[in-house]
C-alpha cells in the first residue's frame, strides 16, 4: 500500500473502516461524522451527526453485508479527499443489490471525518 498516493491510502482505510462499522454496529458511525456533516440517502437529506446516525440506525434491516467492487479517491484543492464506492449489498433475506456511495473526507484535529456522504441503490427504471 506504500506505493499508492497518500489520498488513496487514507480513502481506502476510511472505506474499510466505514463499511466494517456499518455492517457490524451502525450506532458507532457517529464517530466519523461531525455536526456540520450532510448525508443524502436515496434522495433524502440529513444534516448533523445526530440526524445522520438516527437515520442509519433506523434502516429497516437486521443484518447487512457490503461487498466493494471498486473505489476511487482524489485529492481536492482544499486538502480534502473525495471517495467514490461502487459495490453490492445484501440486507437480511433481500436479493443482492448494487449501490453507489460518495464521501468527502476532511482532516480536522488530525482525524479524518466525513463531511458529505451520498448513497444510492443502483436501481434503474427502464420505461
UniProtKB/Swiss-Prot annotation:
One of its GO terms (molecular function) is identical protein binding. Changing residue 7 to A: No effect on interaction with GDP-bound RAN. Decreased interaction with nucleoporins. Decreased localization to the nuclear pore complex. Decreased GDP-bound RAN and other proteins nuclear import. PANTHER family: NUCLEAR TRANSPORT FACTOR 2 (PTHR12612). Keywords: Acetylation, Cytoplasm, Membrane, mRNA transport, Nuclear pore complex, Nucleus, Protein transport, Translocation, Transport. Changing residue 23 to A/N: No effect on interaction with GDP-bound RAN. Increases GDP-bound RAN nuclear import. Increased interaction with nucleoporins and localization to the nuclear pore complex. The gene is Nutf2. Changing residue 84 to E: Decreased homodimerization. Residues 10-121 form the NTF2 domain. The modification N6-acetyllysine is found at residue 4. It comes from Rattus norvegicus. Changing residue 102 to E: Decreased homodimerization. It comes from the Eukaryota. This is Nuclear transport factor 2. Pfam families: NTF2 (PF02136). Mediates the import of GDP-bound RAN from the cytoplasm into the nucleus which is essential for the function of RAN in cargo receptor-mediated nucleocytoplasmic transport. Thereby, plays indirectly a more general role in cargo receptor-mediated nucleocytoplasmic transport. Interacts with GDP-bound RAN in the cytosol, recruits it to the nuclear pore complex via its interaction with nucleoporins and promotes its nuclear import.
